[in-house]
């Protein structure tokens, strides 16, 4: 089980949450105890009543709704205490079967009847279209002056001069957090200390711990011309840290893509294995809900994939274009960087992001990004890697 799935399991399959919902369902059940057939979902001729109770009351007590996103699209979700997870008919079936079976005496019987005799209770078309709509809800997002980090034990609100922590239940009315964006660790306020820029920029090579910090600084080392020793370049680290911070803060102020390339690029050569993907892909995937895209899908050779954003979901916070090829067509991203973002999914479906709400973007490349002029320059924050 992945860490993200582990959080979903512990959060939504919580025994107290299920027990509370089951008590409400027992107070007005959608099933009856038939004198001949035993426990059944509905009596003869009373299907409409049972359907209404099941879809309108039972499923909503378990937190299942159709959430409206971007004012035009509905997505099936489960809600609990300010956290939402995107679901499908299989998840709903598994959760309902698990929860109902916990009801003493009749739970197993009613699940058996629903599964064998009345399988339409779990039919994809019926269950997803019958979920009740949930309107006027929006996810927590960063603003110009505030950033949020979501941990298993609550929400961290970060301003320039303060850090506050509160539970998911204390979110503002009408706001929620996607479960995919919850970091799989608890927040420890005792680890927070006042930021010291001089200490942050200083070479950490001789200090213990801070492994990722030192990894990033190692990318900013180059050999001196005199004795060929590795020398730390503080200005390059500033550029890398600035780009990294821009990606972590999800407010779109400057519409740019962070690009990490080798410093000494030579035409016709590919200088890989220097750690660029570790920084822009592996590192950020542990801090943001990330989708990695093979950057070779976007090239001037006409290799165009209409479903390049297939795996992007409403909860996605960052898109990594990994290992851009020598003819990476950066122009394809122009409108996606400065405007809205439309993501087409295979087998139907589309997700649209407003220009302020779309995921941040970064790319790593062993080659120069082709293109000249302000349209290219204004959309790029370039960080060079000098470890070769």
PLM features: what roles do these ranges have?
Residues 321-324:
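Walker B catalytic acidic pair
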Residues 63-91, 157-315, 381-383:
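P-loop NTPase catalytic core of nucleic-acid-dependent motor ATPases
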Residues 329-353:
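Conserved catalytic/switch belt of AAA+ P-loop NTPases
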Residues 2-178, 356:
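Intein modules and their embedded homing endonuclease domains
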Residues 372-387:
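A short helix-turn-beta junction within AAA+ P-loop NTPase domains corresponding to the substrate/partner-engaging
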Residues 308-314, 345-364:
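AAA+/SF3 P-loop NTPase mechanochemical coupling elements
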Residues 365-369:
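Short, polar loop motifs at secondary-structure junctions
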Residues 95, 279-283, 332-336, 363, ...:
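Alpha-helical scaffold elements adjacent to nucleotide-binding pockets in ATP/GTP-utilizing enzyme cores
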